[in-house]
């Protein structure tokens, strides 16, 4: 089965075919660095990181570029509010972005172009659009002339005539004169300098670039005139991505991207996330509660990337449980290896012969279906639960039902596929994760103490021990004859 992706441009799923064999050029719109990243950012960058990981796993060389918008009205507003400079605000929140993404196990991009580092390229692109009749200057500003681009609206499906009808009565000649535009739908490529704001010299006077032109210039500089994948949140379809297409394609005469991909929104308890509603949650606030970063990543992956996802306490609790199941499977040889004679399991990961083909095929089928991560997770759960069952059998019967060689195959397959989804237990955490919980010997000792308490009719003590074990994620199953089985939840 070939990889199929939903292309926002054509509004249908298409078989993915790269421009060049085995090479993929991918551009993702990055953050405007004026505040800490929120759950919407987590959803977006985990989604594209997962897609990138899968493409690499499939053997592609992925050239992944993601920009930073480091000059913008929001950054300037934040600088004024905090009495600092635009550069210091941008630097602070760029560093915060990297900290958050590292915790979420999002791979770094191959390149992070910044708007302020590409002023010359931006000006050259604006000048080219002006020469070709797609842009005009007006009082120090430069605007894109939307009606000159006949395909405007092809991504968003919006028609100028419909937008104009919707705007009727809201734009009059005085507004147009004030805005210095020929048409209310024209948008700024270059903004004339304002007192106290950063500005650069240009053929149109001192000023700074508009938002949309930045990405067009950086895509061309880093990846060329036509790329394979352009991705971002669904909120960027209009006007940002629509305007990018208008700028780039008017300049080059070539399509900007073959595939336009957009991730769905995050809601909080069914409501749109916003500061005004008081339900705005940053990544770091959530992780500092603490929520395991991999549980947050798991939460994002439980929905296919194009679908909306609702953040609730129940959803994050379910994601925590899901991650604990997979983590337990990943830690299986570190916990049970000594009893099985399984030494240095990490060495097995490089042995491709240990990968179970049937699971690989099911995983690939799921991911080829427009990166269907919920279906892919189901395959990981199947492997992890099999390993959990074998661990419980080993504890109670002293041996596993499955051979060591087969257990190795299940484990290597689980770890390999988990890595494709970015779900990993760091090496330095492997021992500590086991030691954080009760050891098997400690559990058996407490069960024996509970049995003795019950024999002495000290039921309050027996209940206390049961509750203590339950708080540690240990479920007890009392059998006839005074036997108690247990397993980790």
From Swiss-Prot:
Zn(2+) binds at residues 29, 215, 240, 244. GO terms for biological process: cysteinyl-tRNA aminoacylation. CDD domains: CysRS_core. Binds 1 zinc ion per subunit. GO terms for cellular component: cytosol. It catalyses: tRNA(Cys) + L-cysteine + ATP = L-cysteinyl-tRNA(Cys) + AMP + diphosphate. Its EC number is 6.1.1.16. This is Cysteine--tRNA ligase. It comes from Trichodesmium erythraeum (strain IMS101).
